A protein has these predicted regions:
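Short, well-ordered alpha-helical segments in soluble proteins
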Residues: 101-108, 123, 134-138, 146, ...
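Generic structural marker for isolated residues within well-ordered, non-membrane alpha-helices
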Residues: 72, 128, 232
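Solvent-exposed alpha-helices and their adjacent loops that cap or buttress functional pockets
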Residues: 111-112, 133-134, 155-156
């Protein structure tokens, strides 16, 4: 699956990030804990250069805990990177970020020398929710649709830390087929840019391979059901996703599956492991 989807505001956001870079002390990149590599924008990685970075693995409550431990180890092997799994609405977990920022930029955060933190991430990874929790009030708009934040914001946390929010930023062409498909399954890409049924079939094939027990228990599938198309049809029949003549409405069945997978109804699922992922070209020229 090759996805070419780059709204105009994202090109503008990239330039805004570049303009702010000289003033930034720490990067705070918000990732989806279920797919930390695919939800990491390689353009942002290149832009931050050697600035210290905290990679927040948000939606940790939805991810496979054992796989998340592997990701923390893999990410912290990178120069200047600290990894922190959390759930963005959990204030106690989120408050750990400030302490890490002070460790990474020890000469900042004092009177007259604010510690400036740029919060970055692709759409729909929970960046706005995290900012609201850090601020202790609603600052950024929150929703389950990608690309809600469209202009930069500066938020003074009143503790010597200034947050610089930026719009969710995808890269111009996502030509890594598996990475693009995993992003689509997670909901990071607007569903109107996708073949929804194809996304569901990819997700079902993944579940049959990695988490077959959870899939079969949720939808009462037999052990003999191993084809993603058959599973989608079974889900459609059992959930009443039918059209005239008793045929399956594949789109509605896909909606049921993807909605439940994204919400964690199928259990704690990680969509990729460190060994699954090859380096991604930023393609930002």
């Amino acid at each position: 699956m090759i996805i070419d989807w780059y709204p105009g505001h994202m090109k503008k956001a990239r330039q805004q990030i570049i303009d702010l870079l000289p003033r930034i002390d720490v990067f705070l990149e918000v990732l989806d804990a279920r797919l930390p590599a695919s939800s990491a924008n390689p353009v942002l990685e290149r832009l931050r250069s050697d600035k210290p970075c905290i990679k927040v693995l948000n939606k940790n409550d939805l991810a496979d805990q054992q796989v998340t431990k592997q990701w923390v180890s893999a990410l912290q092997s990178q120069q200047g990177v600290r990894a922190l799994p959390l759930e963005a609405r959990n204030r106690a977990e989120v408050n750990k970020i400030i302490g890490l920022c002070r460790i990474l930029a020890p000469n900042r955060g004092r009177p007259g020398r604010s510690l400036r933190v740029m919060v970055v991430g692709i759409p729909n990874v929970g960046k706005s929710t995290l900012i609201n929790t850090l601020a202790g009030k609603k600052i950024a708009r929150v929703g389950d649709k990608p690309a809600i934040t469209t202009c930069p914001q500066q938020i003074d946390l009143r503790n010597g830390v200034l947050l610089h929010d930026s719009p969710g930023l995808l890269w111009p062409v996502m030509d890594n087929p598996d990475g693009a498909s995993r992003l689509a399954v997670s909901g990071a890409i607007g569903d109107n840019a996708l073949d929804y049924v194809a996304v569901a079939l990819y997700g079902l094939a993944f579940m049959l391979d990695r988490y077959p027990r959870q899939l079969r228990e949720r939808y009462k599938l037999s052990e003999e059901t191993t084809d993603p198309g058959e599973v989608l049809e079974s889900i459609g029949r059992k959930r009443g996703c039918l059209v005239s003549g008793g045929q399956i409405d594949s789109y509605r069945a896909a909606e049921v599956f993807l909605r439940e997978l994204r919400a964690g109804t199928l259990g704690r699922i990680s969509l990729e492991q460190p060994d699954d992922v090859a380096p991604v070209d930023s393609n930002d020229d």
